[in-house]
Each structure stands twice: as C-alpha cells, then as structure tokens.
C-alpha cells in the first residue's frame, strides 16, 4: 500500500524473506526498478536485508551495519569492490570472503610452511610483516599444480558446488560453476587468482584492493 501511495519514507524490513525462490527473484527485479524510477527522487526507500546477494542486486546505495555500528556506506559496487575492512568483506560476500592470515617476507607471501606464494609485483610496495589476505570463493580454482587442501564439506547449490576445505589451520571455501561430487577428506589441489587478492593490515583495515590499488 505504501508503494502504491508513493509514501515519502518507505522502510522495507526483509520483505522477501518468507517467499519462495522464484518469487523472490521476480520481486527483486521490481524493487531494483524502484531504485531506478522516479520513486527514488520523490521518496526515501530503506531496504533492510541480511542477504548480501540481494543487497548487491538491488544496486542502490548501501549501509553496512554490524551489531548496530555503521561500518561503510556507498554505492553497492564500490562497497563490494573496495570493502573498508575484513568485516565488510565478509558481510558483503556469500559465501564470506576467505580471509587468510599470512606474512610478507623476502618477496614471498607465507601462509604456512606448505603454502607459500611469490609476492606479485603489484604488491611489492608492501613492507615485510603480518597481514590478512582476502580472496573470494570465485577466485579460487582446482589446479593440479596447486596446493594441497582437505575437503570438509561439499555443498551443491543449484548448478554450483561449494567446497569447504582446510590445510592445517587455514580454512577456505571454493566455488565451482558446475555440479561435482566430493567426499569427506578428499585431497584436492587449489590455486588462487593473484590479480584478485585483497590485503588488509593487522587491524583488519583494507590497504590494497585489486580494483583500485592501495
């Protein structure tokens, strides 16, 4: 009714949460059109969601809130590409961005004794020391020449497969764009796209984004 009346202030608190998948998809398009229509100039529309994919699809200005504290504001694309800190990176990705503690030392990124990478040239300006490295599930891939990980969970979602894996204390999630079957404790080799690697400082604040540099 508020939408029909073009109310000046619209507060939509997870309006699609109890709907089936197809109806949610259809109504997301409706709400996205609202952001792009005259309604956006006439009214203030606040859409609350705990679904990061939904927030990104609506493509408006977003406010990332955690435990009542505003962490970052801005256009959805800007926040997604340049999360201010680790918490924002985790909240705005589904599954959450993989965050790996590591050390830069002697032109290497060292996660542990069995997982070391050559420091890419675009990160050569970073000083030696402790950092957190972020990589999305979509930027990890199965690679026979990669590093060994052990499968903890294989989760099929629609036409995609999510592999939850570990190597010693490191835990990551990898997305495969097809249905694949894996068993508990399967050994797989993976690599990461170094051109999509984020770097956060010891306090968890962003210091390098692949979309804008440092």
For every predicted segment, state its role.
Residues 97, 108-214:
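Non-catalytic connector elements of ABC transporters
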Residues 67, 101, 197:
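Conserved coupling/switch loops of ABC nucleotide-binding domains, chiefly the family-specific signature
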Residues 1-87:
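ABC ATPase nucleotide-binding domains
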Residues 81-105, 193:
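C-terminal boundary and immediately downstream tail of ABC-type ATPase nucleotide-binding domains
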């Amino acid at each position: 009714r508020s939408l029909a009346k073009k109310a000046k202030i619209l507060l939509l608190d997870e309006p699609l949460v109890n709907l089936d998948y197809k109806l949610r998809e259809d109504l997301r398009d409706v709400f996205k059109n609202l952001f792009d229509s005259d309604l956006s100039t006439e009214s203030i529309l606040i859409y609350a969601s705990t679904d990061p994919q939904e927030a990104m699809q609506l493509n408006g200005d977003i406010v990332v809130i955690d435990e009542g504290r505003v962490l970052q504001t801005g256009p959805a694309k800007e926040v997604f590409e340049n999360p201010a800190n680790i918490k924002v990176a985790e909240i705005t990705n589904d599954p959450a961005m993989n965050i790996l503690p590591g050390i830069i030392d002697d032109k290497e990124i060292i996660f542990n004794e069995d997982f070391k990478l050559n420091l890419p040239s675009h990160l050569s300006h970073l000083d030696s020391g402790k950092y957190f490295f972020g990589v999305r599930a979509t930027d990890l891939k199965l690679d026979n020449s990669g590093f060994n990980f052990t499968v903890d969970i294989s989760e099929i979602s629609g036409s995609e497969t999510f592999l939850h894996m570990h190597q010693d204390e490191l835990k990551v999630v990898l997305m495969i764009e097809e249905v694949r079957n894996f068993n508990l404790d399967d050994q797989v080799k993976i690599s990461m796209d170094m051109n999509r690697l984020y770097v956060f400082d010891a306090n968890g604040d962003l210091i390098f984004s692949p979309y804008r540099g440092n």
